[in-house]
Every structure is written in C-alpha cells, then in structure tokens.
Amino acid sequence: MVSIRLPDGSVRQYEHPVTVAEVAASIGPGLAKAALGGKLDGELVDTSTVIDRDASLAIVTDKDADGLDIIRHSTAHLLAYAVKELYPDAQVTIGPVIDNGFYYDFSYNRPFTPEDLEKIEKRMQELAKKDEPVTRRVVSRDEAAGYFRSIGEKYKAEIIESIPQSDEIKLYSHGGFTDLCRGPHVPSTGKLKVFKLMKVAGAYWRGDSKNEQLQRIYGTAWTKKEDQDQYLHMLEEAEKRDHRKLGKQLDLFHMQEESPGMVFWHPKGWALWQQVEQYMRRRVNEAGYLEIKTPMIMDRSLWEASGHWQNYRENMFTTESEKRDYAIKPMNCPGHVQVFKHGLRSYRDLPLRYAEFGSCHRNEASGALHGLMRVRGFVQDDAHIFCTEDQFISESIAFNTLAMSVYKDFGFDHIDIKLSLRPDQRAGTDETWARAEQGLRDALTACGLTWEELPGEGAFYGPKIEYHIKDALGRSWQCGTLQLDMVLPERLGAEYVAEDNSRRRPVMLHRAIVGSMERFLGILIEHHAGAMPVWLAPYQAIVLNIAESQAEYAQSLTQTLQKQGVRVAADLRNEKISYKIREHTLEKVPYLLVVGDKERDAQTVAVRARGGVDLGVMPVEAFVERLQEDLRSFK
C-alpha cells in the first residue's frame, strides 16, 4: 500500500506503486490533463515518475512557477530538436533555463542568421503540434557517452565523461531527438504552445575563452500568449530606456575602445553622479559612519594574507615595481581592516563604522562588459562595521532601516530581500553559524521585513542579506548586501581589548546599499527613463530668452537662481523659442523658464514643467519656493 499526502492535507492510498500522472488522474481528469510534473517530497519530478513509497506530492501545472520552468526547459530541448532536423551538422551542447526564458548553445560551421531563426521557430511550432510523448530512461555513464559519441555529439560525450560514475544519467527523447538532462520535462511536446526565439549571441564552450566559440540562441516561453506579449512589450520599453542610448542622447557619458569597461563621464553625467554620491555621503554621516580613504594599489603580501591573491587573482589587475608585486584593489575590505588595526582598539570604541567611496578595478572578461551595468573600473559605496557579538543585531537593524529609506528616496518601492545561509564548505562552528543566521533573521523581523531564505548560498565566511530592487519595468537588480564575515578579521589580525582585558576578534559586517555607483546610475537612468527626479537632475531648470532684448534679464535670472543653489543654465542662442523648448524637452529637463518682454518688465518667469505642463507666469520667488518644495524631502 502506498500513501500519498496531497497539499491540502488529504491522504490517498494506492494498492500498487503509481506514477505522478496516475495520481493526477485519480484526483480528476482536468488535473490529469494539466499536469506537467510533480513535487515529490519537495523534489521536482516527471509525471512518469513511479512512486513506490509513502510520500507527499503536489501536482505541478502551468499555474505554478515550477511549471513555467519545466515548460522553458522543455522548449530549450525543442529548440535543439528543430536545429538538428534543419541543420544536421550542428552539434548540441547545453540548454538551461534563465530568467524569462532559456538558451541553447550550438557548434555550427557558419553563423545563424535572423532568417535561420525564423525557420527554426517555425519548425519548433510544427514539432510541438505533433504532440510527441517525451520519454525518460536512466542509463550508465558509459552507455550514455558511447551513444553520443556514436552520433558525433562530442560535446555531450565530454559532459558525460566529467560526471561521477555514481551519478544517475538521464536521457530524454521525443520524436527522433535524444538529449542528456536532469529533467524534469513536459509529458509531451503539445504542452509547448507559447514561445519565441529572440536572438543569437556568441558563447565559449564551458565559459572558457580558450575554448571554441559557440552560438547561443536565446528564446522565451510562457504559459499564456498574453504573458508573452506583455514580456515582449517590456523588452521594447527597455530598449527605449537603455542607459547606453539615453547616456548618448542626454550627453551623460561615453565608453571607448581604448579603455574597455571604464567610463568617461561628461559634465551632466558627473553632475548626476555627484548628486547620488553627496546624498549617500550625507546619509552615512548621519548614521554615524566615519569616511576614510584607502590606497588603490597595495602589496601582494596583503592580498595573500586576505586570501584574495590565491582565490581571486585572475580577476585582479597586477603590476610590478622595484621587484615588488602589487595589485590594484578589487575590493575595499582589506584596506579597511588596516585602518581598524592602526592603533589599539577597545570595546569602548565599538561599533566602528568605516565608509569609503572606494575606487575598485576587476578584470572582467571583455565579452561580459555592458555599458554601466558591467564595468572594470567602479566606485562602491562601501562600508565595514567592526562590532562585538552583542552589537551585530542592532547594527544590522540600523543598516536595514537605512537601506530601505535610501531605496525609497531613489524611487524604488519594491524590495525583495534574500538571506543566504550556510554552505557545505564553511569556516566556523555550527553554533556560530546558527547564532549569525538567527541574528540576521531577528534584525529583519525587527524592521518588519519579509525575506526568502537560500540554503547553501552563503559565503564560506558567513551568511548574508541581499537587497534586490525592482525597477519600473519589473526587472530585479541586486544592489545592497549585508555580509557577516567570520574569517577576514582573523586572517588580517584585527582585534580589540575586551572589558576583561582579553584580546578578541571583532565581528565584521561588510555592507553596501547601491553597490557599484556606475551600475546604480545605469539602473536609475533606465528606471526613470532619463527623466531624473528634480533633486537628481543634472540641470533642474534652463532659462530661455525669446529674443536678444531679454538676454540680459535671462542671464541675471540664471545667476540669481544659481546663488540660491539651483542647478540652472541659460540658453541665449539666437534660435526660435520653439526650437529651444523642443531641444531641452528632449533633454528631459524638469523646468523650462521662458522670458519675453512681459516677463522681463514684470521681473517674472513663464514656467513649463517636464511633460509640457504649462504652469503659467509667476514671480521668481514663487518658482524658487516650488522648486524647494520638490527638494524638501531630500534636504
């Protein structure tokens, strides 16, 4: 007798072993038809999986997030099936699920074209309509490797040969196509109804630039056409908001080949940067942080002591001088520990909070660079808190409160929080980890925050909290972190004198709110579509004269506003006023101040707000008061 416990708590009993599909059918024909897989004691499995023991089971349908993942994974295999039918000489490699879709990497003797993608997608639709059953079989490693070698699929054979002998090898087949996969997959290809191929990009075999370059075909798949249409619309909107495009249009920054992954900031872009940096500086100063500055280049010995030289060297820029090896810092933490160590610290000094807008460099692969979002040179709003074990919860609470407030000020109201817990390989005792993890939970609870826990995702030296902000298009970006470190203080010899005169290691909290300033500015630009809030805008207002006779008044007005702290410029060009208004409207300036003879004579100004809103004529003081009202919450 097999007892199956369902999500509603009910138990069904079967005289013999049953498949997931049979359990679904016993519940009802509708569920049997909708079933894509099952969650058996928490593990995602195929509908053909046989249950021969008492277990808990949830039937997975297209209404579940797991169901969508199964659909996307199966659609990746459908893509490979179609490619092999149309281009038999192409070799298949891997095809995982990614955010909003999937990809599959192929080795082929010529580049795939947009026309090829159309043909492949059409063939996928034809194969899906055949509604061919998807079957799974478990084989030995040698049998699987031999099969793929026999059909000329060298990449698949190489993958299999790297799998431990003891691991289970699953092969999935539909129609004339067989692929290696952990699964699960849909029961038949007819379940795959809504998908689209998006683009082709380059990729290296096993992600190593020394290996052969492959072709990566990206696709998206959904359960409903409305969802796919909404996603494609979001992509169109994202293209309009692309920070690289807006950076050029708004004259904020540029990148060039002579300095890959580094940013050339233009005056308006640097003005935007300064608003973000000065705001962050004010917030950390108010929160009791002490700002410091540490060297960009430090001797190899320090990086060896911290462990970065052994574990991170390939991502570091190094140099040599007078027979000494140096590294340009990829992160600020070892330098902050040196400041902490400079002098004898007492428990009375703690907590010590060191902040730095630290300039870091990492040798990212050139193919991974992407505008401001992935760079080699960046500044981080970095800080490290040195405290006692008794203080780390209160410090975590204070940081959570600060981070949430900052995100709100920048216009981000939806924050997803994730707590990464102990990995298998880790430093410290289970007792220490349990205290650290529970402390972070308590800090989040005290702030009224909810979070998702990620078992095994913590760093080997401690658990961490991640803060993921959601932008105007619903995209999620990880920006902030709060990382507890049980290792670096010991590695670098940081200690303080406790109340009983013993020497103890401080608890070290690594923390950042925006993370990379460059990346955060890219996110901000796209979130606001370049129309920055008044407090962030490079220029808050532009004064426009209609004719030469108002130039002197326009210039005087500009100077008056500048003295009151307004970021303002005058456009006195001998151009039609309609032309000047249109140009500055495209530049997304919050306020355009138009002055003609009437405004000059009355010492007033005609105000146009962003979006073409005519606010009418008002005294200069009234405009300044309106602007101050916009800014008041950030003063």
Swiss-Prot record:
Top-rank taxon: Bacteria
GO cellular component: cytosol
Location in the cell: Cytoplasm
Alphabetized PROSITE patterns for the sequence: AA_TRNA_LIGASE_II, TGS
Cofactor: binding details: Binds 1 zinc ion per subunit.
Signal peptide: none
Catalytic activity: tRNA(Thr) + L-threonine + ATP = L-threonyl-tRNA(Thr) + AMP + diphosphate + H(+)
Residue ranges annotated for the TGS domain, each copy included: 1-61
Enzyme Commission number(s) from the entry: 6.1.1.3
Full protein name: Threonine--tRNA ligase
